[in-house]
Design a protein with these regions (language model features):
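Flexible, low-complexity segments enriched for small/polar residues
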Residues: 141, 145, 149-178, 189-422
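Active-site substrate-binding loop specific to GH73 endo-beta-N-acetylglucosaminidase modules
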Residues: 1-241, 419-422
Length: 422
């Protein structure tokens, strides 16, 4: 998929006219982004993720335009797999199998990837070997461990990790304790078990934590509500085995075992269809830069404090209003009632299990404390909890139990404490 997104699919070696002038050259998009976004970043880093400066006091670029041009040659000759050796430009989309090398379209000359790789890649090794050497060079680059480690910490724990935190995790990237480099399971374990991720004292500092990105906030709500479908199956993209949309004319439709075949009645809350309401949807990033930039700075006090707030880049005035409105609609639609009683769910409708919550409905303090723990990690202020309890007390005595639960839930979900991960 990334080859498709970054125009590397069917990327062909350069062609020349009779005088030797280039007629076409390899597309450089993927070569640039695989370095900038997916491995080493733009500038050299210290092992703790801080900038490594040159003798002139300026940041040191990790690569240059020549590096991009040379690396683009590595990625030539790859296309969708086909048994036809001449199908480089015509093979149909195939998202289930690896790309295939078509040697006639690969640049088999030498490639000088300096400063990423000190020794040029020799000529006539074939596309697979060229690719292996180039990826190994990026994987072994001293920037990769701190660059990837910091990004993972930002996504999983806090937007502004300390250099010491980044260093500890990067060392686990370099060696998982068994001599293996790049063991992401060990890296994630190091991130989540680090002192800075577990310490209540660290969590209390103003700079610690992160805004929950909307799609994870929503999926966390679904988990917290123990949502499931009666069929055990969930609505997703409806595709055939070759990745094409299902239509009445589709010649090779997938079987029910290969795809979520949903009937007409299913949940309106689909994680691939909520971007207009919450600024995110599963698999719908508008660019390869993700929904937001990892170094986004919000002008004002946070910028003055030197803090980055990546997820706030998609939290503008519009979405600051639409997200709570979406949550209100979500709570009402996902917890439907008929005269105060739960409505039977269709086989593919996500339905929460509120058995525990309904046992607490006559104890507003216990209900609020429960939602505080599940959705705000116990961080709701005493004032916020008191206000939610007051709102529940103010409901008419005739209010159905499920509606009381919905009220407490919505008021909790729309608090700042429920939106921030600490």
């Amino acid at each position: 998929m990334m080859a498709e997104y970054l125009s590397s699919l069917r990327n062909a070696k350069a062609t020349f006219d009779a005088s030797g002038a280039a007629l076409t050259t390899p597309d450089e998009n993927y070569a640039r982004e695989v370095m900038q976004l997916f491995s080493i970043g733009l500038v050299r880093l210290q092992p703790d993720g801080t900038l490594l400066l040159g003798d002139d006091g300026l940041p040191i670029p990790t690569y240059n335009q020549t590096t991009i041009t040379e690396l683009a040659k590595v990625f030539t000759g790859w296309a969708y797999p086909s048994s036809n050796a001449n199908a480089f430009r015509t093979a149909g989309a195939n998202y289930y199998n690896a790309l295939q090398l078509f040697p006639a379209f690969h640049d088999d000359g030498p490639k000088n990837l300096a400063p990423v790789l000190a020794t040029p890649i020799p000529a006539s090794q074939g596309g697979a070997k060229d690719l292996q050497l180039a990826l190994d060079a990026l994987f072994q680059h001293p920037n990769t461990a701190p660059f990837i480690s910091k990004l993972l910490i930002q996504r999983l724990v806090t937007s502004n990790p300390s250099p010491a935190y980044v260093y500890r995790v990067a060392q686990r990237f370099i060696d998982d304790g068994a001599g293996v480099r790049g063991n992401l399971g060990a890296v994630v374990r190091a991130i989540l078990t680090d002192h800075e991720a577990r310490s209540a004292e660290v969590a209390a500092t103003p700079s610690f934590g992160k805004l929950k990105e909307p799609i994870l906030r929503l999926s966390g709500i679904l988990r917290g509500l123990k949502a499931s479908t009666s069929s055990g199956r969930y609505v997703g993209f409806r595709v055939t085995v070759d990745g094409q949309p299902i239509t009445s004319a589709t010649p090779r439709p997938a079987t029910a075992a290969q795809i979520n075949m949903a009937p007409s009645a299913y949940s309106g809350t689909r994680l691939d269809g909520v971007q207009g309401s919450i600024a995110q949807a599963a698999l719908r990033s508008p660019t390869v830069f993700n929904f937001y930039h990892s170094d986004y700075v919000l002008p004002g006090p946070l910028a003055a404090a030197g803090l980055v707030v990546p997820e706030f880049e998609i939290t503008d005035d519009n979405f600051a209003i639409s997200v709570p409105n979406f949550l209100r609609t979500f709570v009402n639609a996902t917890l439907p009632t008929t005269n105060g009683a739960p409505t039977p769910a269709a086989p593919y409708t996500l339905t929460p299990d509120l058995t525990q919550e309904l046992t607490l409905v006559n104890d507003s303090a216990a209900l609020v404390a429960h939602f505080n723990l599940v959705f705000a990690a116990g961080s709701l202020s005493a004032d916020a909890q008191a206000r939610i309890r007051s709102a529940l007390t103010a409901l008419p005595a005739s209010t159905a139990a499920l509606d009381r639960v919905r009220t407490a839930l919505l008021l909790t979900l729309t608090t700042p404490a429920a939106a921030i991960q600490k």
